[in-house]
């Protein structure tokens, strides 16, 4: 009996699919102000490796951001037992902090990379995609920075996240900056010293001038390093720490209120400082929060896979 002849169109489609699965690797990167997280998958979706590297905030420089991205990609390949030459097989989505600024986004798009293809978007966009599995919704990122993002009926909305010192209220970096401001207030006699403030000034050898010099060159990540201590002292009853956490939460409440006013059916709160802030949020905010379906890395993988599919379609 002669074998059944494969339909030519179906055969070509199957061949393209097999070639795509063999040749493309999918990489999703969530590049934030403190660290970058990456996940490498086969085109089929099979997980190959995860990795963590340094920050990838475009406001701190395109070169530094791509260095962190490449560190994570190389680590993924190493952990997956694959040669570094496979960088050229990767279709990536780089979801980077600072990519919402047009100039920084264009500079990132022009930057050379070793990947087969790379789409660049904001970390907030990827977080929103991941949190709601591509469905309509809003997300608030409370990490080193703070920004709100919504995907509603095919449109995107961004609130806040313009960066320190002008924005990012409620973020870890903002809390750290405000805590040091209050150290100077206490030094000037404008407010009373508290255990938190005395510990912070001790970090600078009790010298307010050292604080001023340090802040002139400090990055958001460095400011944000003080935020966990503020949260710890707030739980212990320190009045300045409590005031800072309440004020930070009020800023996050404001972002949530704006997302709800835009029509977001549900909200997700994510980011490295989200857990510390959640107990301080208003009930109106917490009542709208849902458990994220996925994270920003998952959202980035969704976009990377769509890009790989488009490459397959034109092959």
Spell out what each predicted region is:
Residues 2-4, 10-88, 130-138, 180-315:
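ATP-binding/phosphotransfer module of carbohydrate and carboxylate kinases, centering on a glycine-rich
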Residues 91, 98-193, 315:
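Phosphate-binding/catalytic loop of phosphoryl-transfer enzymes
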Residues 93-95, 199:
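Short catalytic-loop micro-motif centered on adjacent basic/acidic residues
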């Amino acid at each position: 009996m002669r074998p059944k002849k494969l339909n030519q169109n179906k055969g070509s489609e199957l061949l393209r699919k097999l070639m795509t699965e063999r040749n493309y690797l999918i990489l999703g990167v969530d590049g934030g102000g403190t660290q970058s997280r990456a996940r490498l998958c086969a085109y089929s979706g099979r997980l190959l490796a995860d990795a963590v590297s340094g920050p990838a905030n475009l406001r701190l420089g395109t070169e530094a951001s791509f260095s962190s991205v490449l560190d994570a990609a190389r680590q993924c390949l190493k952990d997956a037992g694959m040669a570094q030459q496979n960088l050229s097989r990767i279709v990536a989505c780089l979801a980077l902090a600072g990519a919402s600024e047009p100039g920084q986004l264009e500079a990132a798009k022009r930057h050379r990379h070793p990947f087969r293809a790379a789409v660049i978007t904001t970390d907030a966009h990827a977080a929103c995609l991941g949190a709601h599995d591509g469905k309509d919704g809003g997300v608030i990122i409370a990490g080193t920075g703070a920004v709100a993002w919504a995907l509603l009926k095919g449109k995107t909305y961004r609130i806040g996240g313009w960066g320190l010192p002008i924005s990012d209220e409620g973020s870890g970096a903002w809390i750290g900056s405000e805590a040091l401001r209050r150290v100077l207030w206490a030094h000037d006699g404008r407010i009373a010293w508290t255990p938190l403030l005395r510990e912070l000034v001790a970090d600078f050898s009790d010298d307010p001038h050292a604080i001023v010099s340090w802040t002139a060159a400090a990055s958001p990540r460095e400011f944000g390093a003080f935020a966990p201590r503020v949260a710890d002292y707030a739980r212990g009853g320190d009045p300045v720490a409590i005031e800072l956490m309440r004020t930070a939460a009020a800023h996050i409440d404001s972002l949530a209120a704006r997302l709800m006013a835009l029509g977001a059916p549900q909200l997700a709160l994510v980011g490295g400082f989200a857990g510390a802030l959640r107990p301080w949020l208003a009930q109106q905010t917490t009542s709208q929060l849902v458990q994220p379906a996925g994270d920003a890395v998952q959202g980035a993988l969704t976009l990377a896979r769509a890009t790989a599919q488009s490459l397959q379609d034109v092959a």
